[in-house]
Amino acid sequence: MKNKEKYLTNFSEAKRKEATQKYNIIKPFILGKQSLSSISKSKGIALSTLYRWNKLYKEQGLTGLIHNTRVDKGEHKLKQNIIDEIKRLALKNKRNSIATIHRKIANYCIENNFYKPSYKQVYSIIKAMPKSVIDFSHQGEKYYQNKYDLIQIRESSRPNEIWQADHTLLDIYILDQKGNINRPWLTIIMDDYSRAIAGYFISFDAPNAQNTALTLHQAIWNKNNTNWPVCGIPEKFYTDHGSDFTSHHMEQVAIDLKINLMFSKVGVPRGRGKIERFFQTVNQTFLEQLPGYINNNDTSSDLIDFQNFEEKLRYFLIEDYNQKEHSAIQSTPINRWNSNHFFPNMPSSLEQLDLLLLEIPKSRKIHSDGIHFQGFRYSNTNLTAYVGEYVLIRYNPNDMAEIRVFYRDEFLCTAISPDLADYSIDIKEIQHARSQRRKHLKQNIASPSTTDLIKEEKSYGYSPQETTKNVKKLKRYRND
């Protein structure tokens, strides 16, 4: 039987976290900051093991470190509260030697009737702690900032060398899917070299890890619009607000694709002038022309709804901003990104990005007619053999025509909704159609189904993109 290629989604969260820990150990060597021999001495890990980890990571990405998970035999596994106590003692006082900590933890275990760890176990736990964390605890925040904080982002010299993500609360009031007046958030990923927009996400929710991950998924993969060629794997990816706004899944995908994931601290500028100027451009050349713009005195105009606003924003980003000459680079962002016939580094397959998609926490049952999700039916011939089984679903809220189906951590198939297969439908349009249907029912008017309402709007609804060359969406095939 042919071996299936393994992706991050094939492994449990625990396995991926363990592999991430291995990567973080060899990361200073990969970035050219520390030799493997010095890492071996500081971490107490055999040099041959570090060489093997580095080789596996270079060849296979993060999955290589998962494949070669080693299990230590003959050692007692320490309880988490013992490990936490060891770390607490290590951070509490910089004068505490490892021998002192070992004696204190032995007394702690005797008092609580726990198994006492060996000196070697205590040593390994302390040496595995990030030096930056220890320095922050022992030396203070100012010392930490001077030593570890990034001062500025250097100027990039080629496309996809540096991507930046940032978020802003737009200065406009629009109608959300429920008809309420609201202000939307915009998440942007910009290529630093060309100023081209690689991905975007608009939502009424405040910035979060989920939205950043979905934007990165869109930015990396090929777009259906030929006027928007920006794609590929960036060498460095700066995301705002720190690790609280970056999911473990996004970190794992970044490691697997060899993206150097870096964070900007809240309230501390880190070379973010380009993307901040872009947000000013959005305000001055796009938003101020629309009803509901905060700085306009006229508040009597009818507000536009979310769907209409999103279509206008998409047109502005792709057909206007990306295609207009930028004064700082003396070129359009798209031409600059495409200069010298640039060929982006792409994932080997879409499966490598699956962890960036939304995950349904509750498993779904496969029925004889497929999988039922969000009021639609999704089918694929591969599901026939799994009727009655429960599967995990991942999906992109910007394209609800298909879902990714996983069975026991293995990718099973892409299931297609026959009702939506010929359209590019996002979850906001589904919510809008449901809202319209509820209004019809409240008025005792015979209402078409949600599906029919979506199709009607897609067939006859105005879209700003109609004024440009239409690009046909890739045909979806129901049989994988």
Swiss-Prot record:
Integrase catalytic domain location: 155-341
Record flagged with keyword DNA-binding: yes
Gene Ontology annotations of biological process type: DNA integration; DNA recombination; transposition
Keyword annotations from UniProtKB, A to Z: DNA recombination, DNA-binding, Transposable element, Transposition
Basic residues bias: start-end ranges: 470-480
DNA-binding region boundaries: 36-55
The organism's place on the tree of life at top rank: Bacteria
Record-linked Gene3D superfamilies: Ribonuclease H-like superfamily/Ribonuclease H (3.30.420.10), Transposase, Mu, C-terminal (2.30.30.130)
GO MF term set: DNA binding
Region annotated Disordered, chain positions: 438-480
Entries under PANTHER family matching the protein: TRANSPOSASE (PTHR35004:SF6), TRANSPOSASE RV3428C-RELATED (PTHR35004)
Protein name: Transposase for transposon Tn552
Organism of derivation: Staphylococcus aureus
